[in-house]
Amino acid sequence: MCKGLAALPHSCLERAKEIKIKLGILLQKPESAIDLVIPYNEKPEKPAKTQKPSLDEALQWRDSLDKLLQNNYGLASFKSFLKSEFSEENLEFWMACEDYKKIKSPVKMAETAKKIYEEFIQVEAPKEVNIDHFTKEITVKNLVEPSPSSFDVAQKRIHALMEKDSLPRFVRSEFYQEFIK
């Protein structure tokens, strides 16, 4: 069976991994079954209704992930693209870290840090991001006393990964190419 899996396209393997993870969660927590509906879209979702950027702004996204992430339309477009590839966990982690930095209450910060860790960092997390062991260790140490910078090292690694891998795929995608025509 494993030899057969190797022959499948990468997107099929990613989808299978996502289904396996969600089924595992479902078996552990049947009361949350409604949250685990697995949508399958042939085409990416349209971005949320925001002001469409100019062509010049959109062209800047090719060279700057930060400019893309700072633009609501660009962020929504990028997120839709990543969802269509079943690879949105890195962006979701980055966004969760941005929201986390804004928390003022130490109690809320500790609760949110635990949720982010359990959802994205720990081994076999539902949306585990691809970071090295050293970065995980630093993050775990930072979470002993949660602060706004607890996830900074991991967030920077994920940002670099998105810049190197996800952004070029987005720029080459039909989704972006149609947008800049």
Curated annotation (Swiss-Prot):
Residues 64-180 form the RGS domain. The keyword Cell membrane does not apply. CDD domains: RGS_RGS5 (cd08717). It is found in: Cytoplasm; Membrane. Keywords: Cytoplasm, Membrane, Signal transduction inhibitor. It comes from the Eukaryota. SUPFAM superfamilies: Regulator of G-protein signaling, RGS. Pfam families: RGS (PF00615). PROSITE patterns: RGS. SMART domains: RGS. One of its GO terms (cellular component) is cytosol. One of its GO terms (biological process) is negative regulation of signal transduction. Inhibits signal transduction by increasing the GTPase activity of G protein alpha subunits thereby driving them into their inactive GDP-bound form. Binds to G(i)-alpha and G(o)-alpha, but not to G(s)-alpha. PANTHER family: REGULATOR OF G PROTEIN SIGNALING, REGULATOR OF G-PROTEIN SIGNALING 5. This is Regulator of G-protein signaling 5. It comes from Bos taurus (Bovine). The gene is RGS5.
